[in-house]
Every structure is written in C-alpha cells, then in structure tokens.
Amino acid sequence: MPGITLLGLGPGNPDQLTREAWDVLSSVDEIWLRTRQHPTVDALPPTVDLHSFDELYENGETFDQVYDSIVEKVLELGRRPEGVIYAVPGHPFVAETTCPKIARLARDEGLATVIVEGLSFLEPTFSALGLDPYPRITLFDAIELSTAHVPAFPPDIPVLVAQLYSRLVASEVKMTLGETYPDEHPVRLVHAAGTKDELVEELKLYEIDRSDHIGLLTSLYVPALGEGTSFEAFQEIVAHLRAPDGCPWDREQTHQSLRTHLLEEAYEAIEALDAGDAAGMHEEFGDLLLQIVLHAQIANEEGEFTINSLIKSIYDKIVRRHPHVFGEVQLEGVKGVLQNWEKLKEAERRDNGKKKKGLLGGVPLALPALTQAQEYQDRAARVGFDWPAVEGVLDKVVEEIQEVKNATNETELTEEIGDLFFVLVNLARWKKIDAESALRETNLKFKRRFTFVEQGASQQGRSLSDMTLDEMDALWDEAKGKERGD
C-alpha cells in the first residue's frame, strides 16, 4: 500500500542497527538511501535493490535545493502502491533535514508514515567523549555555523557541532567560533563515533581545520568558555540583584532613580571613546550595558516589557530599516540609505497610527546642543535642504561673525552667537567632523595645558593670580611645545 517508511541506519556500526530496522531491511526489495556514504550501507542485505540521492548532492547548488528535491522525490515514491523505504544515517529525526519535512507533508496529504528508530550519532559521540550531556549542552549544525558572522549560542554552555564534513567547513567554523572563543581554546574532534574507526582528537580551536581525519562522520565538541561569559548569565545575575535575597540598593531602584546613573555612564563611555582608550571603553560599555539590563529587569517586574521583547523589537527594526541588506531593495550610497531610512520611519509611524512627527521631531531635546544642531542639519540635508557647496557655508561663517560684531545689545548678541555656533556646526558636518567631539577634544586640550600652567606656577612657589599674562602665556607655550615634542 502507499506510504513512507523513514528508517534510521544508526551511526555507522552495522551491529548497532535496531532489530526493527534489520527486519524491515530484510523484508523489502528496494531501499532509497539519502546517501551511500555511510558505513552501514555495505552491510545491508545483498538482495535489496539500493538507490541513492548522491547525484543530487553532486549537481545541486545549495543544500536547501538538494533537500527539497529529495523530499519531493520521496513523496512521489511514497504515492506508489508499494510505497517507499527511505533510509538515512543515524536517527530519522536527529540532525536530519529531510525526514521532518517528509513526515509533515505526508501527513498533510494523508499519506501513511512509519518511523523506524535508529541510534543517532549523539549516543556514541557522548560515549567517545566520556561525557554526560545532562543537564545541558547545545547542538549546532556546522553548515549553519560556517555561514554565520558570530556563534548564535551562549558560550558558557558546551557545544556539539555536527556534520563537520570537510576541512573547508572546519575552517569556516573555526573563523566563526573565533569571534567568541580564544584561538587556544581546547576542543575535541570526534570521528566515526561508535565504529571501528572511531577517533577523538584533542586540539586547540585554531588547529581544527588541520586534521587529516575530517569526514562525513566528524563532529566538534567545544567546552564551555567559563562562568559569566554569556548574556543570559549576565541577565541572571542582574535579576538576582533585584531578588528578595539580592542587594538592598538595587532592589529599591526605579527607572527614574537610575536616570542620573544612565546619563553618567553614557558620558563616561563617550569620554573613553573620545580618548581612544580601549580598556576604558571595555569597562564603560560594560557599565552602560548594566544600566540597560537593569532597566529591562525593572520593566519586566513591572509588566512593561522584557529584555527579550526589547531585543526582538530592535532586531525587527534593523531588518525592516535595511531592505538593501536583508531584502531586494537597491539604494545608491549612504545618502540613498539615509533618505530611505526616513521614508521607512514615517511609514512605520503611519502604520502604527501615530501622527506625522516631522523630520526633526525624532531628535531628542535632551541632546547636547552641538550634537542636536548637527543632527538637525544632517536630517535636513537628507531631503536636499543644504548648501550646494561648502563655500556657501564658509561665506555664512564670515557673515555670522560680522553680525556678532554688529550686535548692539545682549539679546542680539545672544542670538547672533547662537547663529554663529550653528553655522560652525554645519561647517563641521560638511567636513565630516563631529562637532561635539571636536569641542570636547579642545576642552580636554585646554584643561591639559592649563593644568600644566598651574603646576608650573606651583613649582615656582607662586599662585596664578600673582602672575602676569605674559608669564602665564610663556608656560602655556611651553605646554604646547611639550605636546609637539619640542
């Protein structure tokens, strides 16, 4: 009768075939194999007519295409009066892409499906490693990992990477893992687990693609990186701070009480960034992350939102706002990207039933004035409201300086100096300089040199108020000379 039997061939040792699987294999005339590249195939009953889909692997452009073709063919064979036996390595539902699809589609069209269990690659792999996977281990596919930019799993949990079938894939997996794990991280390659050719290699991460034993039955075991190395662990420790047995100070905090801390940490991070201090950024970005996770924990307790909903929201926004990366939209350069960004934002507001905010409406009023001015000018320029050339900006600077000179009262002077600041910010924007950072650097330079002047006066046993301007200028020039290396 029509139907599909999905049969597991086990990890590769013919002795590990289940009794049920052997009975089925011995009672049929024809078997369709996903691949002949499996040790158990040679031990199948010689009277059985074997077919395989290896040709699809040789001619297919992607694994997805190959698997879709296999699924389609197996369903077609299953509709025959005699049905079909489809045999796969290991267990039909462990690290097998085709079987779950076949079972689902067969069920949808009312086609009978029988599952014949098989020992998966997991049990002999864990035995070879001498490892009990309980209470936790992550399973991941080498192909998926090889195409990722970063590992999509927490590093404080051991990982078993399956189907590391070639040195090329191993090299790509190594590069991805190297974004999280150190090159010297100890790992183990497990080859042909459960068969007479079983081999376990203990290597460093950077060595995995140098193994001469990599093949279709190779897996990679990556031990945990260590306690406190995942975002989830960080989330847990922050939640503990807020728990009844946590920290009294953290437990009494609210969104509003943490406002100042959030602002301070942001400015400290910017200070480290402006100083080019990598160690400082490492510390300050961590402090800033603590503030974000702490606010998310408070929000979770108050039923406002969770850290996961926060991440999902920004994830969706990034994908939505980058159709030129994650979709089929073609955009010309950065200007085209920014203009499309504004269009997408406005469309989102309409879809959410919000009033039109205006191009400048999304700029926070709490921003520092220079940053706010530059953001206003950036946004206006995106829609073409800008000088055609930088010469127009330079002329405007000269004009505003003259208007400052011509101001006759405090009100006029305040307005004209504000206009001068604004056009100077525009000049910085044209020159691709961040005005806020530029002024901050100048402030730091002034502080550094003035401190030198103070120290120079102190070394002379004098106070600044006792010194003439020429004497202070001399120390100032000395400070400048030291900075230049004179």
Model-derived regions, located:
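Beta-strand/loop-alpha-helix module characteristic of Rossmann-like adenine-cofactor folds
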Residues: 2-7, 23, 30-36, 79, ...
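Extended low-complexity intrinsically disordered regions
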Residues: 201-280, 328-407, 453, 457-486
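Conserved phosphoryl-transfer catalytic core
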Residues: 325
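Class I S-adenosyl-L-methionine
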Residues: 1-116
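Well-ordered alpha-helical segments embedded in enzymatic catalytic cores
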Residues: 69-73, 124, 265-268
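An amphipathic alpha-helical micro-motif enriched in hydrophobic residues
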Residues: 262-270, 278-300, 304, 308-316, ...
